[in-house]
């Protein structure tokens, strides 16, 4: 039942388009105007003063200034100085101190997987940024302390 009514509607529309071409052109113009309006709404209309005054050179200069400020802040205040050099010796006094903190120890740990030294504890001493201050048991008893002061 719907099929004959659809055929009827389509033939009626063709007849209207044929007899009244200006009506079909009006519909086409309305659709065109509607599409133009939608496109206009989608267009970016007001970019603002930031985009209008955009200059890549000044932007790059400002970025460099901000980056140098940030690098200065992080490198000076928060840079942790190395305590050991690349061979695992203390930088402050060039002593090859074992991580057990005994001055005369020849190495009491298993060979380090990175540098093959017997003086490295659980972590390799090469370029390390910290030192053991003391060897303390779980009960809090101090077994050994750092035999000399190491500056920060």
Swiss-Prot record:
Biased segments, Polar residues type: 1-16
Organism: Mus musculus
Pfam families reported for this sequence: ARF7EP_C
The protein's name in its UniProt record: ARL14 effector protein-like
Domain of life: Eukaryota
Cystines in this chain: none
InterPro entries, per the entry: ARF7EP_C
Gene that this polypeptide is encoded by: Arl14epl
Residue numbers spanned by region Disordered: 1-27
């Amino acid at each position: 039942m719907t099929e004959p009514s659809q055929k009827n509607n389509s033939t009626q529309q063709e007849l209207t388009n044929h007899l009244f071409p200006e009506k079909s052109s009006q519909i086409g113009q309305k659709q065109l105007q509607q599409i133009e309006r939608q496109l206009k709404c989608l267009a970016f209309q007001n970019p603002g003063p930031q985009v209008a005054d955009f200059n890549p050179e000044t932007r790059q200069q400002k970025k460099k200034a901000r980056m140098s400020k940030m690098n200065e802040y992080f490198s000076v205040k928060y840079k942790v100085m190395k305590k050991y050099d690349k061979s695992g010796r203390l930088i402050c006094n060039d002593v090859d101190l074992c991580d057990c903190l005994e001055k005369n120890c020849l190495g009491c740990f298993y060979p380090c997987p990175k540098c093959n030294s017997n003086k490295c504890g659980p972590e390799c001493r090469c370029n390390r940024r910290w030192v053991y201050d003391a060897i303390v048991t779980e009960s809090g008893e101090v077994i050994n302390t750092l035999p000399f002061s190491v500056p920060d």
